[in-house]
C-alpha cells in the first residue's frame, strides 16, 4: 500500500518543510518492511479561480488524481473527527493494508478548505481539533501521525501508548 500525503499549497523552505520531510523519510524507511513501499508528499498548486467554491472544486479535482481505483481517501478538515487516537488510526491503516488497498491518500485542503466532493469520497475525515492551525503545521502533524501509525504497527518504542 502506497502512502501519499496530497496537500494544496507549497511549503516554503523552513522548519515546517524540514520537519515534514523528516517524518516522510522516516515513514518511508519504516514502512517498506511493513507493506508500505513508498511514502510521498505531493503539493497541489492553489487554484487561481476568483470564487472560493470554484477554487475548492479545482483543487479537489487535482487532489482526486492521486487516488487510484480502490484507494483509501482520508481527509483532514475542520469538521472532521478529533477523537480518533493514534492506536485506533494505526488499526485502520493496518486493516486497509491487509485488505490489499493500493494506496492511502491523506488530503489537506488549501486556505478555503476542502470541497464537499472530497469530504463525500473520504472514508475517514479527521481534525486536529477546533483551533485553526497553520497549514504547514497540519502537514507536519499529518505526516507525524502516519509515521506514528507505522511505529505502532512495527512495535517500535516511538509510541509508548497509554500509561497502564
From Swiss-Prot:
Enzyme Commission designation: 2.1.1.177
Pfam families in the cross-refs: SPOUT_MTase
Binding site for S-adenosyl-L-methionine: 109
Superkingdom, natural source: Bacteria
Record text on subunit structure and interactions: Homodimer.
Family statement: Belongs to the RNA methyltransferase RlmH family.
Protein name per the record: Ribosomal RNA large subunit methyltransferase H
The species this protein was found in: Methylobacterium radiotolerans (strain ATCC 27329 / DSM 1819 / JCM 2831 / NBRC 15690 / NCIMB 10815 / 0-1)
Amino acid at each position: 500500500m502506497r502512502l501519499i500525503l496530497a496537500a494544496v499549497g507549497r511549503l516554503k523552505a523552513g522548519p515546517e518543510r524540514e520537519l515534514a520531510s523528516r517524518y516522510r523519510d522516516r515513514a518511508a524507511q519504516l514502512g517498506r518492511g511493513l507493506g508500505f513501499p513508498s511514502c510521498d508528499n505531493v503539493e497541489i498548486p492553489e487554484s487561481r479561480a476568483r470564487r472560493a467554491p470554484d477554487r475548492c472544486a479545482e483543487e479537489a479535482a487535482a487532489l482526486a488524481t492521486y487516488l487510484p481505483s480502490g484507494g483509501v481517501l482520508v481527509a483532514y478538515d475542520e469538521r472532521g473527527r478529533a477523537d480518533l487516537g493514534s492506536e485506533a488510526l494505526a488499526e485502520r491503516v493496518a486493516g486497509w493494508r491487509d485488505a490489499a488497498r493500493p494506496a492511502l491518500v491523506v488530503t489537506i485542503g488549501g486556505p478555503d478548505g476542502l470541497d464537499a466532493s472530497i469530504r463525500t469520497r473520504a472514508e475517514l475525515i479527521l481534525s486536529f481539533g477546533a483551533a485553526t492551525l497553520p497549514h504547514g503545521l497540519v502537514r507536519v502533524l499529518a505526516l507525524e501521525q502516519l509515521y506514528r501509525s507505522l511505529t505502532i504497527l512495527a512495535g517500535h518504542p516511538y509510541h509508548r501508548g497509554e500509561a497502564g
